[in-house]
């Protein structure tokens, strides 16, 4: 089993960007924890971060046939990107949407997700653990 892990805009700034909201772990820390969990589960992951909406769409489109599922934190694109939503729908792979913070308990403009209707589930509000819970969720879903 191989899972594509996608990190959206500004996640490269984790550890220094608003740690009171997003925590003190860096993206490298999160990727290392995901890699360890993947090893424990006996699966492969490939992690990719970009600040570009188009590059995220390209990676999602190229995932079909190469990956069994997608774990995605679309970050700010959650609330704006119909293009990412449509790419996930077209890829026809199971996807889990994750967020470090609880997007439903933040500013009103952050509460709507264009991605969630295309995902098998959404996990948010657990900091870096949202990613680990998301990886376990997609693993269990595909394994069924």
Curated annotation (Swiss-Prot):
Substrate binds at residues 73, 79, 86, 100-101, 110. It is an enzyme of class 4 (lyase). Gene3D superfamilies: Dehydroquinase, class II. GO terms for biological process: amino acid biosynthetic process; aromatic amino acid family biosynthetic process; chorismate biosynthetic process; quinate catabolic process. The record marks 17 as: Transition state stabilizer. It catalyses: 3-dehydroquinate = 3-dehydroshikimate + H2O. GO terms for molecular function: 3-dehydroquinate dehydratase activity. Its EC number is 4.2.1.10. Pfam families: DHquinase_II. Pathway: Metabolic intermediate biosynthesis; chorismate biosynthesis; chorismate from D-erythrose 4-phosphate and phosphoenolpyruvate: step 3/7. The active site is at residues 22, 99. PANTHER family: CATABOLIC 3-DEHYDROQUINASE (PTHR21272:SF3). NCBIfam families: aroQ (TIGR01088), PRK05395.1-1 (NF003804), PRK05395.1-2 (NF003805), PRK05395.1-3 (NF003806), PRK05395.1-4 (NF003807). Belongs to the type-II 3-dehydroquinase family. Homododecamer. This is 3-dehydroquinate dehydratase. The gene is aroQ.
């Amino acid at each position: 089993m191989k899972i594509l892990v996608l990190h959206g805009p500004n996640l490269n700034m984790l550890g220094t960007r608003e740690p009171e909201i997003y925590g003190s772990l860096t993206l490298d820390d999160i990727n290392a924890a995901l890699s360890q969990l993947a090893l424990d589960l006996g699966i492969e992951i490939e992690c990719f971060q970009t600040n570009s909406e188009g590059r995220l769409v390209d990676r999602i489109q190229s995932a079909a046939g190469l990956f069994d599922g997608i774990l995605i934190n679309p970050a700010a694109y959650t609330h704006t990107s119909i293009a990412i939503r449509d790419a996930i729908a077209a890829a026809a792979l199971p996807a889990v949407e994750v967020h470090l913070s609880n997007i439903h308990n933040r500013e009103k403009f952050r509460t709507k997700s264009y991605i969630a209707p295309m995902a098998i589930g959404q996990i948010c509000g657990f900091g870096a653990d949202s990613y680990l819970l998301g990886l376990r969720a997609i693993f269990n879903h595909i394994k069924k």
